[in-house]
Curated annotation (Swiss-Prot):
The modification N5-methylglutamine is found at Q235. InterPro entries: PCRF (IPR005139), Pep_chain_release_fac_I (IPR000352), Pep_chain_release_fac_I_sf (IPR045853), Prokaryotic/Mito_RF (IPR050057), RF-1 (IPR004373). SUPFAM superfamilies: Release factor (SSF75620). One of its GO terms (cellular component) is cytoplasm. Belongs to the prokaryotic/mitochondrial release factor family. The keyword Phosphoprotein does not apply. It holds the Pfam family RF-1. This is Peptide chain release factor 1. It is found in: Cytoplasm.
């Protein structure tokens, strides 16, 4: 693998460090955070790349010792052993660099909405909603994240029909995005006198916090028509072409303003109305996409559509996507979710690396 293009990383990192001390950048939080992220990303890449280059040079040095007939036999043995270790390390570093270079999910840095809803299973499902929310809250605490409940529908039994929270902090979406889907619980309800195991299901949706929709109107996409204002019954109330009709060609939205006697004022009003209508249309489409994302994430809440099973009698947690089984249910429910999340991240990275090959 050729990494020649990384030789200029030191200069780029130095340039970014200069930006981080620029008052203009510091006062622009959005730009400042962007520079901070790039600096952290390139610094990590640079550290691994330098170790990779050093290992490659060490390989060449050890090969030279092995091919030198005049070298001490003991030194050659050491060089041979070190060469084997170096070759393994180079493969590891090569993979590490590729992982760092994998395309980033643009949502990874965003704060995240956690939505948990009771599916099949009645009261048991509602109780498990509360259990999962506690699990995610405790995990968030260990990560230094902030959890803010946005809405909830509590039931008298101590569970929830649904609960929605905003989780804020570093890399929230990158860690929690693998939690979307149906979570199945198998346990004996407290009200069960026969000791039978009941199976219930809960849906979890993980949605990145949407940034405010910014609207830019291209004036070349607008058609302006002017005409005389008309009053009740259609009679003309103005002798000049002061009324304005604006058509937004891409969407077909039409706005007419004729309240003012001035064509300029009617045009300004019409543009204001058009902007509001376009913004509403964009936000409606955006919300429709969010709804579709939620539906595709969580399925129907049927017990058979599970991504993970929590079996209380066995103390077992199984993630069906990667065939991971851990007999640490109590620990995981207590917030040690990293034991499940990090194997999922590793699996995801491996799949993406396969796609690059």
């Amino acid at each position: 693998m050729l990494f020649d293009k990384f030789d200029d990383l030191d200069n780029r990192i130095e340039h970014l460090e200069g930006k981080l001390s620029d008052p203009e950048i510091v006062n622009d939080q959005k730009e400042f955070q962007k520079v901070v992220r790039e600096h952290a990303h390139l610094s990590k890449l640079n550290t691994v790349y330098k170790e990779y280059k050093t290992a490659c040079q060490d390989v060449e040095d050890n090969k030279a010792i092995l091919h030198d007939d005049g070298e001490d036999p003991d030194l050659k043995e050491l060089a041979k052993a070190e060469l084997e270790e170096l070759n393994v390390r180079i493969v590891e570093l090569d993979k590490a660099i590729k992982i760092i270079l994998l395309p980033k999910d643009p949502n990874d840095e965003k704060n995240t909405f956690l939505e948990i809803r009771a599916g099949a299973g009645g009261d048991e499902a509602a109780l498990f909603v509360a259990d999962l929310f506690r699990m995610y809250t405790r995990f968030a605490e260990t990560m230094g994240w902030k959890v803010e409940v946005m809405s909830s529908n509590p039931l008298g039994i101590g569970g929830f029909k649904e609960i929605i929270a905003l989780i804020s902090g570093e890399q929230v979406f990158s860690k929690l995005k693998y939690e979307s889907g149906v979570h199945r619980v198998q346990r004996v309800p407290e009200t069960e006198t026969q000791g039978r195991i009941h199976t219930s299901a809960v849906t979890v949706a993980i949605l990145p916090e949407a940034e405010e929709v910014e609207l830019h109107i291209d004036m070349n996409e607008l058609k302006f028509d002017v005409f005389r204002s008309s009053g009740p019954g259609g009679q003309s109330v103005n002798t000049t072409d002061s009324a304005v009709r604006i058509t937004h060609l891409p969407t077909g939205l039409v706005v007419i303003c004729q309240d003012e006697k001035s064509q300029h004022k009617n045009k300004v009003k019409a543009l204001t109305v058009l902007r509001a209508r376009l913004l509403d249309k964009l936000e409606s489409e955006h919300n429709a996409k969010i709804s579709e994302a939620r539906r595709s994430q969580v399925g129907t809440g049927d017990r058979s559509e599970r991504i993970r099973t929590y079996n209380f009698p066995q103390g077992r947690v199984t993630d069906h996507r990667i065939n991971l089984t851990l007999y640490k249910l109590e620990t995981i429910m207590g917030g040690s979710l990293d034991e499940v999340i990090y194997p999922l991240i590793t699996h995801d990275q491996a799949e993406k690396l396969k796609d690059l090959e």
